[in-house]
Curated annotation (Swiss-Prot):
Keywords: Growth regulation, Heme, Iron, Membrane, Metal-binding, Monooxygenase, Oxidoreductase, Transmembrane, Transmembrane helix. Heme binds at residue 441. This is Cytochrome P450 83B1. Induction: By auxin and continuous red light. Stimulated by DOF1.1 and, transiently, by the generalist herbivore S.littoralis. One of its GO terms (molecular function) is heme binding. It comes from Arabidopsis thaliana. It catalyses: (E)-(indol-3-yl)acetaldehyde oxime + glutathione + reduced [NADPH--hemoprotein reductase] + O2 = (E)-1-(glutathione-S-yl)-2-(1H-indol-3-yl)acetohydroximate + oxidized [NADPH--hemoprotein reductase] + 2 H2O + H(+); (E)-phenylacetaldehyde oxime + glutathione + reduced [NADPH--hemoprotein reductase] + O2 = (Z)-1-(glutathione-S-yl)-2-phenylacetohydroximate + oxidized [NADPH--hemoprotein reductase] + 2 H2O + H(+). The gene is CYP83B1. The keyword Heme applies.
Length: 499
């Protein structure tokens, strides 16, 4: 009897695996490179420029292809047409995030919007952000902060120009955005070179690094113990403790009744008022406040700086475009002495340069991972549930079906002619620097405000040249990829005062 039960069990098991194998084979999965047992295509991935590697694969396998990364299936989208199908037509089925160890820990178990799941909590918090934190009126309220910090940066450049020296624009712009973000988020201005700013930057960079790190347990659930052996788990635990301690100190300062009154309410002031009022169906805790602060500081500090650096890099490589941008700004502003935010709508070519820079060098080259909630079809191919989805925004920006035969060329005029109506607000799927759909970046307007004002003033106040002995063709365009895509080699230029 026992033998019969064993035989029956073996037959049932064999039938199960046979049926599962048959079902898998019947799926029409997107094509892709063959991988190795267990690790899949992990050994083929490029760590530093994954967007370039995935773009090359799209040329071999098409605008949608699949890979195996350890035990996870990955599908990559590389065309505007399929990006629209994913982010608009079927957006709701692709709103989930894969549960990755570093992201879960550093985002307060998904309370932060960028890495959280699409739940009732997410929808309520996003609505709160759009109404209370990132509305046009709230963004405008921080205008004095942006303009004051911009003038501080201009003063440093004036000093260098007086001495016929050079300036490291990469460093100056990062300092500008760090100061603006700290004042907007915390109501505090740190000394750029002081210990408080250093602590903030150290914590921020380690947080960003761990948010972008894949752990063994993410790819090989049965080998999670390797995270402990390699020290990754200890590093994650230490980093989160330092982050949490820092944010708790800021909350305690905000709650201090003896704290000096702020001229403009900072984001932390607004969030703590929401904490006191408890207007939501879900309890809003200190952990929620900290997670919302991360939504502001993690993407805000270096992305705006990266955009301006790339824009200035392209203009210095293309002198005709530089002259056209400067002529426009100087014609519109005249002898006013500075560009203010109300002037920006009158500078269409400057806006076109920003768009073209974002197209060629999207600061988030691969949109944050999504995960299929249920079985789906994209581009006629089957996408099983729990598949990780990547939209290669860098590749989409080079899609010849969307951009014609010259997608690799820097031509700002395209946004004033054949692509005049194309914008980055999520409805034009050939340009996706902020994503699109239900998971689109809610702080887009805040981010662009931090790009336009320093960029316009750099063009208005100074003429720019390369250091002696360097030609435009010598400029290296190598990238340094993290959560944001920076120019790897700092942009060092020589300023000459114009006004």
């Amino acid at each position: 009897m026992d033998l019969l039960l064993i035989i029956a069990g073996l037959v049932a098991a064999a039938a199960f695996f046979f049926l599962r194998s048959t079902t898998k084979k019947s799926l029409r999965l997107p094509p892709g490179p063959k991988g190795l047992p267990i690790i899949g295509n992990l050994h083929q991935m490029e760590k530093f420029n994954p967007q370039h590697f995935l773009f090359r694969l799209s040329k071999l396998y098409g605008p949608i292809f699949t890979m195996k990364i350890g035990g996870r299936r990955l599908a990559v989208i590389s065309s505007a047409e399929l990006a629209k199908e994913l982010l608009k037509t079927q957006d709701l089925n692709f709103t989930a995030r894969p549960l990755l160890k570093g992201q879960q820990t550093m985002s307060y178990q998904g309370r932060e919007l960028g890495f959280g799941q699409y739940t009732a909590y997410y929808r309520e918090m996003r609505k709160m952000c759009m109404v209370n934190l990132f509305s046009p009126n709230r963004v405008a309220s921080f205008r004095p902060v942006r303009e004051e910090e911009c003038q501080r940066m201009m003063d440093k450049i004036y000093k260098a120009a007086d001495q016929s020296g050079t300036v490291d624009l990469s460093e100056l712009l990062l300092s500008f955005t760090n100061c603006v973000v700290c004042r907007q988020a915390f109501g505090k201005r740190y000394n750029e070179y002081g210990t408080e700013m250093k602590r903030f930057i150290d914590i921020l960079y380690e947080t960003q690094a761990l948010l972008g790190t894949l752990f063994f347990s993410d790819l090989f659930p049965y080998f999670g113990f390797l995270d402990n052996l390699t020290g990754l788990s200890a590093r994650l635990k230490k980093a989160f403790k330092e982050l949490d301690t820092y944010l708790q100190e800021l909350l305690d300062e905000t709650l201090d009744p003896n704290r000096p009154k702020q001229e403009t309410e900072s984001f932390i002031d607004l969030l703590m008022q929401i904490y006191k009022d408890q207007p939501f169906s879900i309890k809003f805790t200190h952990e929620n406040v900290k997670a919302m602060i991360l939504d502001i500081v993690v993407p805000g500090t270096d992305t705006a700086a990266a955009v301006v650096v790339w824009a200035m890099t392209y203009l210095i490589k293309y002198p005709e475009a530089m002259k056209k941008a400067q002529d426009e700004v100087r014609s519109v502003i005249g002898d006013k002495g500075y560009v203010s935010e109300e002037d920006i709508p009158n500078l269409p070519y400057l806006k076109a340069v920003i768009k073209e820079s974002l197209r060629l060098e999207p600061v988030i080259p691969i949109l944050l991972h999504r995960e299929t909630i249920a079985d789906a079809k994209i581009g006629g191919y089957d996408i099983p549930a729990k598949t990780i989805i990547q939209v290669n925004a860098w590749a989409v920006s080079r899609d010849t079906a969307a951009w014609g035969d010259n997608p690799n060329e820097f031509i700002p005029e395209r946004f004033m002619n054949e692509h005049k109506g194309v914008d980055f607000k999520g409805q034009d799927f050939e340009l996706l620097p902020f994503g699109s759909g239900r998971r689109m970046c809610p702080a887009m307007h805040l981010g662009i405000a931090m790009v336009e004002i320093p960029f316009a003033n750099l063009l208005y106040k100074f003429d720019w040249s390369l250091p002696k002995g360097i030609k435009p063709e010598d400029i290296k365009m190598d990238v340094m990829t993290g959560l944001a895509m920076h120019k790897k080699e700092h942009l060092v230029l020589a300023p000459t005062k114009h006004i």
